[in-house]
A protein has these predicted regions:
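P-loop NTPase motor core of the ASCE superfamily
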Residues: 101-102, 541-587, 729-817
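Short, structured coil segments at secondary-structure junctions
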Residues: 514-516, 737
Length: 817
């Protein structure tokens, strides 16, 4: 098969038959966890894209390109700011080396290219037009003669190029209404051709194709050598494979085509292009050469086939024998197809479908070929590997190429082509940023930029910086949350972690490289910490202090703002303290006693009954305590010793006094985070609320969480909620203000359904439920800024980070032995 490409101009490829194809990259769309309705929407868009071409040819390619891990990591380094820049860059470099040693310099990245044959507009026949056509024909003949004699240059008429460019603009406008596309350029074509001829190890984004042109007034010249340069290699054709030798290695390639489709490909579940990305651990390429058969021609072909089948039926009847079931079934299908074509006036499509499998040696090629055949077998598609036709099928992958074999044509409808899932993939996260792990379905690295949401990025479905980590105990919530906070701090963020279980107390020892920027505030019940959590001490603004004092005292005493007798008395006492010189919660008790009424004395006694608990004196001061908690370091951790948090199942009415005091302290600390949020707006900040459910269950906590989230959005701060159930976050206002979401393993079916609904995916779909139930430690469902949902494995890479963030109790050595 001769090399088909005659000339390349931007995204236009001219072949030697006078045809011109316009090629585009179909920017992949996320297909994972879509509901059937959403899948049908994509299907209809693609069907209309194909059906709008009433005539001509379409060439669709799924190509396994390579993307550079090192380049992504280097781009990530550009995102780093702040005091820990040197530490972060060293960490990213170590990450890069570890990733490259595990998976190599490049990762497989599937790209989708689609080419449409441009049809010349029918123009009125005029003398001027006739003369122009004659002139073009003569010049083409002369160029062909020159080319045959000299063979050095290819000449292309500028007028011809300009005419096709005008048509391509109209086509691009039509396509881009339905899908995001990018016009290809010479570098794309160069990479594609070199890839087909055995080139490996080059990252797609680093590749350059040198194709100089010389433009004259009437024509443009290009060296023929430059056009065929990407095909440089030694090809040895065998009956069942090609041996392609390049300077840096040898590749063996085998080609399959469809022999027959023996059953129905039911949509959704027939998306071959989508599922084969997940199925195979090795790269494969696929080509679809589609010739459009106009409706009239298709009807004529179908009716001729119908006559043949009827003849067979009559022949059997005349010979007193039964018509075979194959003929009867075929007649039914033909009748159905005829009525469909007649009613819809749609075209039919001649499909030549070729799959390319490559391997470094013959043994591996054989194994891969068997795997590909088995995969297609399961979908009722029988593949065949034609003897002696490998080079011809190889040629079908080249841009603007012709169909090589007519023996394996499948007549299909636009519905069938749309149901193959062309362009569907699983995309998660950002192209660069914090490396958090990899997608379990595609194996691709996943990067996040936690501060990006507020920038209003194109395509994002949220501008909320807040994030949620949900899941049952031991699934990896705290670990993954710690990892994201740690890397965010390295990348320049400032963090405040509320650590009620005191799990992060050893971070200065376990994270020595950033120990100088870690500040651990451990509030024990010692005398020197007395009153540090008093609302009047911890908050700078007196108004904020007053508001927090009301929240805490109503929470502890159970006095509702709707209580017409007690609430006004308490409110009056708090306001009096706010307006006085010496401010503290003990002063509120004094103010209530000074009131002298039965109600005020009763409230004073009630509040005072809390003050003699072990660590309650953290909450109460008499106005002589000064604020000494500093949050100036990059990573600040606040711990309160001896906190007793209620169980998740305990209702608010059943809280013990210790539990009430513990939750009250968490509310104070979390409100203190408001002051932290209102610092420098140019620095991204994180407020991390571990065990957030404990205060999200009470009214004061819910109000506070919304305050934090709203302030965070305005002041460039993300509030991270780490909690066990989505119920805690299902308040509509809060739910709509969450950006990134992570859900870890859950076994309770009701919780699973709620989590799936929280992620906006079909909660009744059994496959979705099974995926969430079967997650292993460190694996989670993620929803990114663009609303894309997938399953990832968190990957800390470094053992020291794993040990630092691991919250499991240590195993005794004797047990191990």
């Amino acid at each position: 098969m001769a090399y088909p490409i005659k000339y390349i101009e931007n995204n236009l490829v001219f072949n030697h038959d006078g045809e011109c194809f316009a090629y585009y990259e179909l920017l992949p769309y996320n297909y994972s966890f879509l509901s059937p309705e959403q899948k049908y929407q994509v299907h209809d868009s693609f069907r209309q894209l194909i059906a709008q071409n009433r005539d001509g040819k379409i060439h669709a390619l799924q190509i396994s390109t390579e993307s550079s891990i090192r380049a992504a990591q280097e781009r990530s380094k550009q995102e780093v700011t702040g005091k820990l820049k040197d530490v972060a860059c060293a960490k990213i470099d170590a990450q890069t080396e570890a990733l490259i040693s595990m998976i190599g310099e490049n990762q497989v990245d599937y790209r989708f290219f689609i080419g449409f044959k441009l049809l010349v507009n029918e123009q009125e026949v005029t003398m001027k037009q006739f003369r122009r056509e004659a002139k073009t024909a003569v010049s083409d003949f002369l160029h062909e003669v020159n080319h045959k004699l000299m063979g050095d240059f290819v000449s292309m008429s500028n007028e011809e190029i300009w005419r096709f460019q005008k048509m391509e603009k109209l086509l691009e406008n039509k396509i881009s209404r339905r899908f995001k596309v990018r016009r290809l350029n010479k570098d794309d074509f160069g990479y594609l051709i070199e890839h087909l001829y055995g080139q490996t190890g080059t990252a797609y984004e680093d590749y350059e194709y040198y194709l100089p042109k010389k433009r004259f007034q009437q024509e443009t010249l290009v060296k023929y050598y430059d056009l065929i340069k990407p095909t440089r290699c030694l090809i040895e054709e065998n009956q069942r494979y090609l041996k392609i030798e390049q300077e840096d290695g040898t590749v063996y390639a085998a080609y399959f085509t469809i022999n027959s489709i023996v059953g129905e490909l039911d949509f959704p579940s027939s998306e071959i292009f989508y599922y084969q990305q997940q199925q195979f651990t090795f790269p494969i390429d696929t080509s679809m050469n589609v010739e459009i058969v106009t409706n009239r021609k298709a009807l004529s072909t179908v009716r001729n086939k119908k006559k043949e089948l009827k003849d067979l039926d009559n022949h059997a009847w005349q010979n007193d024998s039964e018509t075979s079931t194959n003929v009867v079934d075929a007649l039914d299908s033909v009748n159905e197809l005829e009525s469909t074509l007649d009613q819809s006036k749609e075209s039919m499509y001649k499909l030549s479908y070729v799959v390319r499998v490559t391997a470094p040696d013959l043994e591996e090629l054989k194994r891969r070929c068997n795997e590909v055949k088995d995969f297609y077998d399961d979908l009722n598609v029988k593949l065949v590997r034609p003897f002696g036709d490998m080079l011809g099928l190889h040629g079908e992958f080249l841009p603007a190429s012709k169909r090589y074999l007519n023996d394996y044509i499948q007549y299909v409808t636009s519905d069938f082509l749309a149901g193959l899932g062309f362009g569907a993939t699983q995309m998660l996260g950002e192209p660069e940023g914090i490396y958090i792990g990899y997608s379990l379905d595609t194996g691709r690295n996943v990067y996040l930029k936690p501060a990006l949401a507020s920038q209003g990025v194109k395509g994002s479905v949220t501008n909320a910086l807040a994030a949620a980590f949900v899941g049952s105990l031991g699934g990896g919530k705290s670990f993954s949350n710690n990892m994201i906070v740690y890397y965010s701090v390295l990348f320049g963020a400032q963090a405040l972690i509320v650590d009620p279980k005191a799990e992060r107390g050893r971070w200065k020892e376990t994270l020595p490289e950033i120990a100088h920027e870690i500040n651990i505030v451990n509030l024990t019940s010692e005398e020197q910490n007395r009153g540090l959590l008093d609302p009047y001490v911890i908050m700078e603004n007196p108004k904020d202090s007053e508001s927090l004092a009301i929240d805490i005292l109503t929470f502890l005493t159970g006095i509702s703002s709707r209580d017409g007798e007690k609430f006004p008395v308490l409110r009056k006492a708090i306001r009096a303290v706010t307006n006085s010189e010496e401010r503290g919660l003990f002063k509120v008790i004094e103010e209530l006693r000074a009131e002298g009424t039965t109600i005020s004395t009763s409230i004073a006694d009630h509040i005072e009954s809390f003050t003699d608990y072990d660590f309650a004196h953290l909450l109460f001061s008499d106005g002589d305590v000064t604020q000494s908690i500093s949050l100036e370091k990059q990573l600040n951790i606040i711990q309160v010793a001896d906190l007793v948090l209620p169980d998740k199942e305990t209702s608010f009415e059943e809280y013990t006094t210790m539990e009430l005091l513990s939750v009250a302290m968490l509310i104070v600390i979390s409100t203190f985070a408001l002051d932290f949020i209102h610092t420098d707006r140019s620095v991204f900040k994180i407020v991390d609320l571990d065990e957030a459910w404990s205060f999200l269950q009470v009214a004061q906590g819910k109000t506070l969480s919304m305050k934090l989230v709203r302030a965070g959005r305005a002041m460039n701060a993300g509030v991270y909620f780490v909690t066990q159930n989505t119920d805690d976050l299902l308040d509509e206002k809060l739910k709509n203000n969450l950006g990134l979401k992570f859900a870890f393993r859950s076994t309770d079916i009701n919780e699973i359904k709620k989590t799936l609904a929280f992620f906006g995916v079909d909660s009744e779909d059994e496959n979705n439920q099974k995926r969430l139930r079967d997650l292993e430690n460190g694996q989670c469902l993620i929803s990114d800024l663009y609303g894309r949902v997938g399953v990832i494995q968190f990957h800390p890479i470094f053992e020291d980070l794993f040990h630092a963030f691991d919250t499991r109790p240590p195993v005794r050595k004797e047990v191990e032995e």
